[in-house]
Amino acid sequence: SGGQSAAQAPGSDASGDYGLYMLCPDGSEELLADVSELRVGMVANVLNEYKGVLPEDGQVFYSCIPVTSYRDVAVKSGKYTGWHENFEDAFNSLLLPGVHMVSAPNVLNDHLMDEPLFFQADHHWTPLAAYYLIERMMQTQGVPVVPYDEYDYLVSGFYNIQGLGDPMDLMYPLLPAHGNVMRSGTEGEDAPIIVYNNESYTAYLAGGNHVWTKYTTGFDTGRKALVIGDSFTTAFIPYLMPYYDEVHRADPRYYNSALNGGTVSEPLAQYGIDDVYIILSYDNGIDSDMSSKTLEYLLYG
């Protein structure tokens, strides 16, 4: 499969299998990672369930991020001009109003070949890539976007044991902000937003290895968000802060309802969450139970 013309709009449905396709110079495509159509339907159903527990104007966003090895195939092989997921429209056709699947590969494609969107030193995306995804999500809601360069940065270095590495942008929040680990609605120890002397990806949210964390942003927007996801959320959350009074984070890999006063639906109501963002790596993506059964279990137990 994968004979679709690269001229077709990114996000439109290919005649072949659902998946991530590499774009070839001759206009053909090669399937790199397929996605189960059945799983797309399962995930869509769960996302619609999340919409059902939010306020009437609440929004749900879902996105899965390729890891660095996919970027390496697209960029370093010299064989391709980009990538795209061919099922974004089909996925969104299954979603209720206010629920959105935003294809990270499609958002990032215009920047993929010549901007640092993934670290070489490990498998994560960079803050710039996370920013581009938030930019698209805000545009979807008609919200003005804070430019990437409006933030001040400490430019650090991030190198692995093989000596591969990249500069690393460690942003300073626009307003004084702070985080706290939350346990059953009670504020616990501080949770750093950026650890400026940490030369690894865990500089963002100090790795974020907590069940539930609340970040108070200093902004007065009248809205609060919950970000559910794995380690790819830690570079994402700092750029979400200007749009919410509070940004909460729940990690489905560690979630424990006994520590958090119930399933996710209880703290959603307790904290007055308006919008939910589900950000997962491809490893925990559509074909993974994390994106369907685990997310549903988080909501209902």
Task: For every predicted segment, state its role.
Residues 1-301:
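Extracellular glycan-modifying ectodomains
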